[in-house]
């Protein structure tokens, strides 16, 4: 029976560490600030942004929310981002995705100052990640690495398989595992004999967006299984990309959905914001 990796507990521990560090900085008259830009009225985005704000404030940081209508022009949005780039009280900028179709996500991400790009999506940060330089790492992949390390497992020398090749999770998590000296395979929908490939993994990260996609026959006995999915099953119940009940017997460690990867994402955003603030103050 696999041991459950408790993402809520780990996220709380990391958040407490960030909060303590922020409190020390506030004593010196320094307060990290995070600005979130929300375009339109997507309910899921709104809920997620509210969560980010609440957690930012709990950590003792300045939290700014800028709301823009669905029909805002690209030009207007870019000028808002440029103003935040110049704002000395803001150290992290996040534009909540997805954006309306008439706005280029690429342009918006490129406009965010890479020193304040706490989502880790700016090409400079992506490039730094790939050459192994210190950079802002996308929050979900950063959280995944912390979850794996929390099991006490040495990543170095392990076989890791990542199912999914998105720019937000799959590719960066594969690169992070490589930077930790794992031997990494990226698999995807076109991979032949996928269960066979997955079964070689000591560490399996699943980010397919397909409910209960990974079954027991994908799992090497004792493997660490990280489920990035957030789906609904046939009964409309929240589930992951891994069929938890089927896989839990084979796995050594496994993240649940909910309560695994999800809680880590906002925590790593706070850690990135703190890092951004410290970097900016150091440069100045």
UniProtKB/Swiss-Prot annotation:
Out of the domains of life, which is the source? Bacteria
Disulfide bond entries = none
**Catalytic activity, reaction form:** (6R)-5,10-methylene-5,6,7,8-tetrahydrofolate + NADP(+) = (6R)-5,10-methenyltetrahydrofolate + NADPH; (6R)-5,10-methenyltetrahydrofolate + H2O = (6R)-10-formyltetrahydrofolate + H(+)
Name of the protein this chain belongs to: Bifunctional protein FolD
| Pfam hit, one | THF_DHG_CYH
PROSITE patterns on file: THF_DHG_CYH_1, THF_DHG_CYH_2
Task: Specify the taxonomic lineage.
Answer: Bacteria, Bacillati, Bacillota, Bacilli, Bacillales
Residues annotated to bind NADP(+): 164-166, 189
List the Gene3D superfamilies.
Leucine Dehydrogenase, chain A, domain 1 (3.40.50.10860), NAD(P)-binding Rossmann-like Domain (3.40.50.720)
Q: Which family does it belong to?
A: Belongs to the tetrahydrofolate dehydrogenase/cyclohydrolase family.
Keywords on this record?
Amino-acid biosynthesis, Histidine biosynthesis, Hydrolase, Methionine biosynthesis, Multifunctional enzyme, NADP, One-carbon metabolism, Oxidoreductase, Purine biosynthesis
Q: In which pathway does it act?
A: One-carbon metabolism; tetrahydrofolate interconversion
**What Gene Ontology molecular function terms does this protein carry?**
methenyltetrahydrofolate cyclohydrolase activity; methylenetetrahydrofolate dehydrogenase (NADP+) activity
Biological role: Catalyzes the oxidation of 5,10-methylenetetrahydrofolate to 5,10-methenyltetrahydrofolate and then the hydrolysis of 5,10-methenyltetrahydrofolate to 10-formyltetrahydrofolate.
E.C. code: 1.5.1.5, 3.5.4.9
SUPFAM superfamilies, sorted = Aminoacid dehydrogenase-like, N-terminal domain (SSF53223), NAD(P)-binding Rossmann-fold domains (SSF51735)
Cellular component annotations (GO), alphabetically ordered:
cytosol
Binding partners and assembly: Homodimer.
Task: Kindly state a single biological-process term from the GO annotations of this entry.
Answer: purine nucleotide biosynthetic process
């Amino acid at each position: 029976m696999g041991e459950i990796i408790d993402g809520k507990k780990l996220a709380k521990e990391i958040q407490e560490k960030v909060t303590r560090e922020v409190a020390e900085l506030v004593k010196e008259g320094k307060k990290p600030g995070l600005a979130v830009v929300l375009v339109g009225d997507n309910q899921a985005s709104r809920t997620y942004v509210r969560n980010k704000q609440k957690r930012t404030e709990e950590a003792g940081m300045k939290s700014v929310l800028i709301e823009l209508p669905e029909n805002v022009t690209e030009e207007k949005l870019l000028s808002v981002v440029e103003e935040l780039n110049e704002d000395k009280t803001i150290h992290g900028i996040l534009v909540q995705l997805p954006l309306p179709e008439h706005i280029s996500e690429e342009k918006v991400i490129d406009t965010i100052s890479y020193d304040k790009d706490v989502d880790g999506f700016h090409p400079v940060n992506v490039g730094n990640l790939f050459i192994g330089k210190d950079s802002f790492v996308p929050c979900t992949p950063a959280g995944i690495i912390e979850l794996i390390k929390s099991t006490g497992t040495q990543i170095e020398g392990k076989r890791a398989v990542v199912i999914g090749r998105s720019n937000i999770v799959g590719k960066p998590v594969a690169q992070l595992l490589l930077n930790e000296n794992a031997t990494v395979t990226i698999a995807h929908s076109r991979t032949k004999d996928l269960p066979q490939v997955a079964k070689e993994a000591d560490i399996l990260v699943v980010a397919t967006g397909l409910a209960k996609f990974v079954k027991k026959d994908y799992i090497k006995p004792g493997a660490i299984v990280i489920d990035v999915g957030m789906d609904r099953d046939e009964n409309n119940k929240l589930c992951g990309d891994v069929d938890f009940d089927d896989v839990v017997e084979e796995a050594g460690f496994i993240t649940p959905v909910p309560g695994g990867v999800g809680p880590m994402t906002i925590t790593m955003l706070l850690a990135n914001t703190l890092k951004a603030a410290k970097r900016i103050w150091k440069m100045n």
